[in-house]
Amino acid sequence: MARKSIRGKEVVMVSDDDDDDDDVDDDKNIIKCVKPLTVYKNLETPTDSDDNDDDDDDVDVDENIIKYIKPVAVYKKLETRSKNNPYFLRRSLKYIIQAKKKKKSNSGGKIRFNYRDVSNKMTLKAEVVENFSCPFCLIPCGGHEGLQLHLKSSHDAFKFEFYRAEKDHGPEVDVSVKSDTIKFGVLKDDVGNPQLSPLTFCSKNRNQRRQRDDSNNVKKLNVLLMELDLDDLPRGTENDSTHVNDDNVSSPPRAHSSEKISDILTTTQLAIAESSEPKVPHVNDGNVSSPPRAHSSAEKNESTHVNDDDDVSSPPRAHSLEKNESTHVNEDNISSPPKAHSSKKNESTHMNDEDVSFPPRTRSSKETSDILTTTQPAIVEPSEPKVRRGSRRKQLYAKRYKARETQPAIAESSEPKVLHVNDENVSSPPEAHSLEKASDILTTTQPAIAESSEPKVPHVNDENVSSTPRAHSSKKNKSTRKNVDNVPSPPKTRSSKKTSDILTTTQPTIAESSEPKVRHVNDDNVSSTPRAHSSKKNKSTRKNDDNIPSPPKTRSSKKTSNILTRTQPAIAESEPKVPHVNDDKVSSTPRAHSSKKNKSTHKKDDNASLPPKTRSSKKTSDILATTQPAKAEPSEPKVTRVSRRKELHAERCEAKRLERLKGRQFYHSQTMQPMTFEQVMSNEDSENETDDYALDISERLRLERLVGVSKEEKRYMYLWNIFVRKQRVIADGHVPWACEEFAKLHKEEMKNSSSFDWWWRMFRIKLWNNGLICAKTFHKCTTILLSNSDEAGQFTSGSAANANNQQSMEVDE
């Protein structure tokens, strides 16, 4: 360091090597800057107005700078002033030295990356990066070692070879893809422009306590599923279902009313009938549930004697008699069908069984028929079939039927009502005794039963018997005795002479049911369909067989023919009734018997199913005439073949299409000229074809636009151009042949027109000058024009020459 004194100035000079020293001494402060001493003296003696005059001083300092030399005292003052005013910080010596070092380091931070192929033999691309930054992620690494560590750790898909700076080159890095990376593919983050890749921020791992994994400490519980006896659970009494548990019997309330009891039931039982769930009687272990009975007789009462070992329930019967009949039941497991007695006197019922509860009886006046006309039609519209279940004990009958008061609710309900009976308990619903108008009752009840949307499927298990009602109309009935085991006696409905009117309304609706009635019988069960017996006198029927069903008999009067003419046609149109029988089960189909006196029927077969017999009156022929044709009608319409339809449609459309085309005028897509119908219907493609006539017109119009050309010259150019186009003269070797043929084609015109011949000679001279024709060709063309037409010969081009006929070149002036 040397100190020099200049006139009026005192400066300190420091070499460049002193800039690298870390300790900044006052004697070593140099920056090549020269200022007058007066300036620095003013800086040494600060005044109060220095802060306000900083800008003025800076201007004076900048004006008085000679070279980059400043005295040491100046930098001291600048450093002290920079504490109060940051503006002087950049002018201090320490700041300038750091900036110089930074600039020097930046100048040496350049490094070159050579991107080479996989075999590391050839350089594909070279790139120079400053500040030792990464070329892939643009992160400044601060030095050669930092860059080396960063590349090896963050971009391990590539292979790097580092070279230190030498005399001939600076630091370099050879980059190549590893062979292992090619097998699995190159990472997308390491390829492409890193500036376009999104920036992802990863925060530091927070020191949080790990949640304890209590999965190993959880006690494993062994789940034990225990079976529950649902029969022992208490149940409610929804929808008036009886509740029976442990020999306790609860019966529905009795309704003893006056003559206007019909008004009561019309409001109460209808609401019961609209329940959302159907009633399903459930019987277990010798329990019996019997529906109500409707007894209607005229003069005398009827006594029912039941002498069975176990519980017996008798379903209702409908009898309209002048004289009553005693029914004796001396069998095991026999259910007596329901009875409807209309009489002036009451009926006594004798039950000699164990655990039998008598159902409440509803004894109404003559208007009881009106009651049932409003209540029982609700039976008909069940959304689900009636399901009846039985136990394995014998002697359980009549558990299929429910009271007339409860059956309406069964019909419209969507789910069954469950009658639950345990341990030889009996729940019997009330009985309804109506008057002489029982026929009016059936006219409204049975049709509704037939209109059910789904079949009634009684399910019988283990030697249980279900019997459906019968309709018997007679004036005098004899006693019926049954001495058979496991034989059902179907219910009898004995009505007056108006039974025919009843069936005219009931059985047709049975036929209109949407689905067949399917009866499912298991284990020696017998299902019998209803019978309609109408006669004046009925004889006794004896059954001495085991497990033999008696088919239903229809014994009608003279009006039976009229009944069946209305009923059986509807049966024929509906779906068939399919009785399902399993394990020695017998299903009997209905019979129609019409006679004044019926004979006794003896059946002595085992497990036999008798076909239906039809014994009709004189009008039976009318019945079959209406029923059998209905059976032959198919349920589905005939469908015409689609292929045949298409063929017919195509044939019809073809004729229509041709007629429409004939009435239209078509034009060419290129020439815009009208086309004939034959041209339109031809298979030729007119889309890409060239119309010579249109091209000739366009060529003529093009030549007419020329100015300073005579008509003869235009005429000659027009003929030559269309000749070359039509004869496809496209090569130099074609020109000699074209000249000869053109002379032959227009020989006569050239002889008549001297100007035309002149232009033809001038054109041949141009062709000869250009070397397209030789002297021999030129001579041939001249001899063709001088020779006669016969000697010249015909046109040998092979194409029609009519297109080159003489055409007028007259132009409208």
From Swiss-Prot:
<feature type="region of interest" description="12 X approximate repeat A">
    <location>
        <begin position="243"/>
        <end position="542"/>
    </location>
</feature>
<dbReference type="Pfam" id="PF09733">
    <property type="entry name" value="VEFS-Box"/>
</dbReference>
<feature type="region of interest" description="7 X approximate repeat B">
    <location>
        <begin position="265"/>
        <end position="640"/>
    </location>
</feature>
<feature type="repeat" description="A-7">
    <location>
        <begin position="459"/>
        <end position="481"/>
    </location>
</feature>
<feature type="compositionally biased region" description="Basic residues">
    <location>
        <begin position="593"/>
        <end position="602"/>
    </location>
</feature>
<keyword id="KW-0805">Transcription regulation</keyword>
<feature type="compositionally biased region" description="Basic residues">
    <location>
        <begin position="472"/>
        <end position="481"/>
    </location>
</feature>
<feature type="region of interest" description="VEFS-box">
    <location>
        <begin position="648"/>
        <end position="783"/>
    </location>
</feature>
<comment type="function">
    <text>Polycomb group (PcG) protein. PcG proteins act by forming multiprotein complexes, which are required to maintain the transcriptionally repressive state of homeotic genes throughout development. PcG proteins are not required to initiate repression, but to maintain it during later stages of development. They probably act via the methylation of histones, rendering chromatin heritably changed in its expressibility. Required to prevent the proliferation of the central cell by repressing unknown target genes before fertilization. Regulates the anteroposterior organization of the endosperm.</text>
</comment>
<feature type="compositionally biased region" description="Basic and acidic residues">
    <location>
        <begin position="453"/>
        <end position="462"/>
    </location>
</feature>
<protein>
    <recommendedName>
        <fullName>Polycomb group protein FERTILIZATION-INDEPENDENT SEED 2</fullName>
    </recommendedName>
</protein>
<feature type="repeat" description="A-5">
    <location>
        <begin position="350"/>
        <end position="371"/>
    </location>
</feature>
<feature type="compositionally biased region" description="Basic and acidic residues">
    <location>
        <begin position="344"/>
        <end position="353"/>
    </location>
</feature>
<feature type="repeat" description="A-8">
    <location>
        <begin position="482"/>
        <end position="502"/>
    </location>
</feature>
<comment type="subunit">
    <text>Probably indirectly associated with FIE and/or MEA. In plants, PcG complexes are probably composed of a member of the EZ family (CLF or MEA), FIE, and a member of the VEFS family (FIS2, VRN2 or EMF2).</text>
</comment>
<feature type="region of interest" description="Disordered">
    <location>
        <begin position="1"/>
        <end position="27"/>
    </location>
</feature>
<feature type="compositionally biased region" description="Basic and acidic residues">
    <location>
        <begin position="232"/>
        <end position="246"/>
    </location>
</feature>
<feature type="repeat" description="B-2">
    <location>
        <begin position="372"/>
        <end position="388"/>
    </location>
</feature>
<feature type="compositionally biased region" description="Basic and acidic residues">
    <location>
        <begin position="319"/>
        <end position="331"/>
    </location>
</feature>
<feature type="repeat" description="B-4">
    <location>
        <begin position="442"/>
        <end position="458"/>
    </location>
</feature>
<feature type="repeat" description="B-3">
    <location>
        <begin position="403"/>
        <end position="419"/>
    </location>
</feature>
<keyword id="KW-0862">Zinc</keyword>
<feature type="repeat" description="A-9">
    <location>
        <begin position="520"/>
        <end position="542"/>
    </location>
</feature>
<dbReference type="GO" id="GO:0008270">
    <property type="term" value="F:zinc ion binding"/>
</dbReference>
<feature type="repeat" description="A-6">
    <location>
        <begin position="420"/>
        <end position="441"/>
    </location>
</feature>
<feature type="repeat" description="B-5">
    <location>
        <begin position="503"/>
        <end position="519"/>
    </location>
</feature>
<feature type="zinc finger region" description="C2H2-type">
    <location>
        <begin position="134"/>
        <end position="155"/>
    </location>
</feature>
<feature type="compositionally biased region" description="Polar residues">
    <location>
        <begin position="501"/>
        <end position="512"/>
    </location>
</feature>
<feature type="compositionally biased region" description="Basic and acidic residues">
    <location>
        <begin position="574"/>
        <end position="586"/>
    </location>
</feature>
<keyword id="KW-0479">Metal-binding</keyword>
<feature type="repeat" description="B-1">
    <location>
        <begin position="265"/>
        <end position="281"/>
    </location>
</feature>
<feature type="compositionally biased region" description="Basic and acidic residues">
    <location>
        <begin position="514"/>
        <end position="523"/>
    </location>
</feature>
<feature type="repeat" description="A-3">
    <location>
        <begin position="305"/>
        <end position="327"/>
    </location>
</feature>
<feature type="compositionally biased region" description="Acidic residues">
    <location>
        <begin position="15"/>
        <end position="26"/>
    </location>
</feature>
<feature type="compositionally biased region" description="Basic residues">
    <location>
        <begin position="388"/>
        <end position="402"/>
    </location>
</feature>
<feature type="repeat" description="B-6">
    <location>
        <begin position="564"/>
        <end position="579"/>
    </location>
</feature>
<keyword id="KW-0863">Zinc-finger</keyword>
<keyword id="KW-0539">Nucleus</keyword>
<dbReference type="Pfam" id="PF23320">
    <property type="entry name" value="Zn_SUZ12"/>
</dbReference>
<feature type="region of interest" description="Disordered">
    <location>
        <begin position="274"/>
        <end position="648"/>
    </location>
</feature>
<feature type="repeat" description="A-11">
    <location>
        <begin position="580"/>
        <end position="601"/>
    </location>
</feature>
<feature type="region of interest" description="Disordered">
    <location>
        <begin position="232"/>
        <end position="261"/>
    </location>
</feature>
